Amino acid sequence: MKIAIDAMGGDNAPEVVIAGVEKARDANKELTFLLYGDEAKIKPLIHHDERLTIIHTPEKINSDDEPVRAIRRKKQASMVLAAQAVKQGEADAMVSLGSTGALLAAGLFIIGRIRAIERPGLLPTLPTVDGKGFVMLDVGANAENRPYHLLQYAIMGSYYAKDVRNVENPRVGLLNNGTEANKGDKMHQEAHDLLAAAPGINFVGNVESSDILNGPADVVVTDGFTGNATLKAIEGTVRTVMHMLKGAIYEGGLSGKLGGLFLKGNLKSMASTFDISSYGGAVLLGLKAPLIKAHGAADAETVYYTLLQTAKMVQNGTVTKVADYFDAHPEVAEAKTAEKA
């Protein structure tokens, strides 16, 4: 199994990328990595080169580059060549910590979409209070979506939850402004009806953003704009709460410090529950091969978990299962036509 790595993407590349790659290589004997980037920077970081191949690239895509233009003009960039390797069958999947916009463009224009999927969605795994977590898509690959896009997200998210997160019969919820079936605008009402009628989906109805961290669904589907806003609200709230707790302990004098000492184990457990690094990266679902985006500020441990996540997608043939579903259920693909009619 070969994974193409954009070794130059991210805030701390290539150091954390190579460290994460070597740890994943040592943990899984079936993994082989193609490292795309500046050989002079990558080679000194490698402790053992077994199952690692460096492909030197003279260019890289920067965070301030215009995404589509960068993909089209920087033909020798590490991200572009890694995506080309996947397209040409030289690698089974790709991982990058680089620019999200550029990576989405590389996925769409180089790797390509599954035939039935009109708009691939970005899927991260998020925490729940019971520690099990849930997946949500789309969280920003698209600014606007139609009802049938959300139906496709539900199908793809369900396969991902089964294959990668080991969830039997995953519950699918539609993010809405109320739990009643008639809630939301026309788009959400139509999406609700499509999800309720779709074969093979365990649809549990609408879910609210105020409740999703309690785990009412294993897969939460939403349009990209709402999903991105919800994701950022969750991340910001978690950071703020943890900061406030630390502040209350350190500023509370002796009693605060004593209380913090007694609560140390509980606070550590809480921090661990909401630490998403062990969940890996966000997957762009709907492409012809797995494409995973890890956070630009990710550390080596997050890179390691992202690579294990990627390997699981490849091993279980998640992309093939999604494509086969749409081939076997033309009525789902026809939801687009029915919606327009």
From Swiss-Prot:
Keyword Cytoplasm: yes
Gene Ontology molecular function, alphabetical: phosphate:acyl-[acyl carrier protein] acyltransferase activity
Localization in the cell: Cytoplasm
The protein's Enzyme Commission number: 2.3.1.274
Catalytic activity: a fatty acyl-[ACP] + phosphate = an acyl phosphate + holo-[ACP]
A GO BP entry: phospholipid biosynthetic process
Superkingdom of this protein's organism: Bacteria
Keyword annotations from UniProtKB, A to Z: Cytoplasm, Lipid biosynthesis, Lipid metabolism, Phospholipid biosynthesis, Phospholipid metabolism, Transferase
Family statement: Belongs to the PlsX family.
UniProt-recorded name of the protein: Phosphate acyltransferase
